[in-house]
Amino acid sequence: MKGRMFCASQASTAICSSMDHVHKSTTTDEDERNSGRAIDRHNPIIKDGRRSFADDFIKLPTSAEDGEMSNKKLEIYKGRRSITGRRSTGGGGGGGAAALLKLITNDIGLARKSFSCVARPACDLIKTPVGSTRYLLGSDPDSITGSVDQDPAKTVEAEAPAGEDKTLTEKKTTCGDTDQQVVVLKVSLHCRGCEGKVRKHLARMQGVTSFNIDFAAKKVTVTGDITPLEILDSISKVKNAQFWTNPTIPKPNVETQNP
């Protein structure tokens, strides 16, 4: 019933107006029920001070630099909103997270480039010493090949093996020049075990080139660059031994002067 109704009598007009008022009150109640729950402004969650709505408002830029910063903030804001939206809905995918990560990596790359541009001249002025490990990593080809500057310690180490080889050759020549002596000993060999002990001992002796053991005759013949007394003393530590024949000891040459 729209507008006001005017009836012929005042009583009928009052009845119609009262019915119209009742109809309006019922329709407003039904509209409130159909519109959903009313927001409770007295809810403590809504009144919580930690709930900030600063992200919902974006300030307009005042200059070009502020405009770039606001664009970055807008992208970050969009990424955050997309992440929170996906978390709330439970959907998969990381489009917002990927965009945010890409933005962060771009900022890090720009920071590194700016730092390298600033620090490169100072690094170029610093010269690394020759003995350091960074010297080999330089761009100078002479430093890599080592043709200009050589480490004296390395040259000494390279020359050392050559000197050792010379000493070894000298020892071999001296050993070859000396006369090999043959010594015959009589050793108390009671069993094959005693023979094995003497054989092992002679094999370990220095200067012995060859030896022969006659178990039946208890005779041991040793050949090498070693004196008879040294062989006798060495074998006597294992078994009782003595010379088979008295060794001929060379007598010193004594010049007789005529009176």
From Swiss-Prot:
Keyword Phosphoprotein set for record: no
UniProt organism field: Arabidopsis thaliana (Mouse-ear cress)
Disulfide bonds: none
Name used for this protein in its record: Protein SODIUM POTASSIUM ROOT DEFECTIVE 2
Residue positions binding a metal cation: 191, 194
Keyword Iron-sulfur in record: no
Domain HMA residue range list: 180-246
Protein keywords: Metal-binding
GO molecular function: metal ion binding
InterPro entries: HMA_dom, HMA_dom_sf, NAKR1-3, NAKR2/3
